[in-house]
């Protein structure tokens, strides 16, 4: 892999690290970036690459929130952290709808992976973010901490995650919207979304790897490792930024950004015909 191609892969890793956690759709951005960069690797590999580099992003969540996610304590009397185990059970419950939909993943991708759908979902969920923020303005959230999330609420958030199977939706965007609709604060909605990403994105990456196979060329191995490492580093920065940002600000800016990006995607591919 030459230096220019390596720079392209690094740029894709940067885009993944930023857009995976901000509710602005990594798919929509990667579609635009790939349109201009044209990485010199097979189409099938790039389809798999765009999903598998999420492993780097997942690792960032594990590293940043390890103390909160690790269910065991050094204390002899309280070796098992019950609250953490309960949180993981709720995450498993939230994963159930997605697991049920696994057989339909490829069909949905084949049916909806096009610029028109991506532009539409970018704009639609951008509008939803603005509407929800306007609705919640001045109200105290009913769910102010992770332990307030019930099993029923976790399952409902998982249903919203199914919507992210449609390209352009944004997995984080869909689950944050779902959590906020059920009364979660912005911080809790984002935090639960990040934790839910661990099994969800790991599973999606594993499925893509199994579908593609584990036979890679030297250039493809370099691309995967570089992309994952870049996504990991950028994700660390972005997650820290977002969690600090939403303590004092709302999601409206991301809603407006989605609307503008959706219009750009629609306009570009309409003119490119």
Swiss-Prot record:
Keywords: Antibiotic resistance, Cell membrane, Cell shape, Cell wall biogenesis/degradation, Hydrolase, Membrane, Peptidoglycan synthesis, Transmembrane, Transmembrane helix. It is found in: Cell membrane. InterPro entries: UppP (IPR003824). It catalyses: di-trans,octa-cis-undecaprenyl diphosphate + H2O = di-trans,octa-cis-undecaprenyl phosphate + phosphate + H(+). One of its GO terms (biological process) is cell wall organization. Its main location: membrane. It is a multi-pass membrane protein. The chain crosses the membrane at residues 4-24, 45-65, 84-104, 112-132, 149-169, 187-207, 219-239, 251-271. One of its GO terms (molecular function) is undecaprenyl-diphosphatase activity. It is an enzyme of class 3 (hydrolase). Its EC number is 3.6.1.27. GO terms for cellular component: plasma membrane. Bacitracin is thought to be involved in the inhibition of peptidoglycan synthesis by sequestering undecaprenyl diphosphate, thereby reducing the pool of lipid carrier available. NCBIfam families: PRK00281.1-2, PRK00281.1-4, PRK00281.1-5, undec_PP_bacA. Belongs to the UppP family. PANTHER family: UNDECAPRENYL-DIPHOSPHATASE. Catalyzes the dephosphorylation of undecaprenyl diphosphate (UPP). Confers resistance to bacitracin. This is Undecaprenyl-diphosphatase. It comes from Lachnoclostridium phytofermentans (strain ATCC 700394 / DSM 18823 / ISDg).
């Amino acid at each position: 892999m030459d230096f220019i191609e390596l720079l392209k892969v690094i740029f894709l890793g940067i885009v993944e690290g930023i857009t995976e956690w901000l509710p602005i759709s990594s798919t929509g951005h990667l579609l635009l970036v790939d349109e201009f960069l044209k990485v010199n690797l097979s189409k099938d590999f790039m389809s798999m690459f765009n999903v598998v580099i999420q492993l780097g992003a997942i690792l960032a969540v594990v590293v940043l929130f390890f103390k909160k996610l690790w269910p065991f304590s050094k204390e002899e009397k309280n070796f098992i952290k019950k609250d953490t185990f309960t949180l993981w059970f709720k995450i498993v419950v939230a994963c159930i709808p997605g697991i049920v939909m696994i057989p339909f993943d490829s069909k949905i991708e084949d049916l909806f992976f096009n610029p028109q759908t991506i532009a539409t979902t970018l704009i639609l969920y951008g509008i939803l973010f603005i509407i929800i923020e306007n609705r919640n303005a001045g109200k105290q959230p009913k769910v102010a901490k992770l332990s307030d999330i019930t099993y029923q609420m976790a399952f409902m958030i998982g249903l919203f995650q199914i919507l992210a199977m449609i390209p352009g939706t944004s997995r984080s965007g869909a689950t944050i919207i779902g959590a906020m609709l059920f009364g979660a604060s912005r911080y809790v909605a984002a935090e639960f979304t990040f934790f839910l990403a661990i099994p969800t994105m790991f599973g999606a990456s594993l499925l893509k790897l199994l579908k593609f196979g584990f036979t890679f060329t030297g250039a493809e191995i370099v691309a995967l490792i570089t992309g994952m490492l870049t996504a990991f580093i950028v994700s660390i920065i972005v997650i820290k930024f977002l969690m600090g940002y939403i303590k004092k600000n709302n999601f409206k800016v991301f809603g407006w950004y989605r609307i503008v990006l959706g219009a750009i995607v629609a306009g570009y591919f309409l003119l490119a015909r």
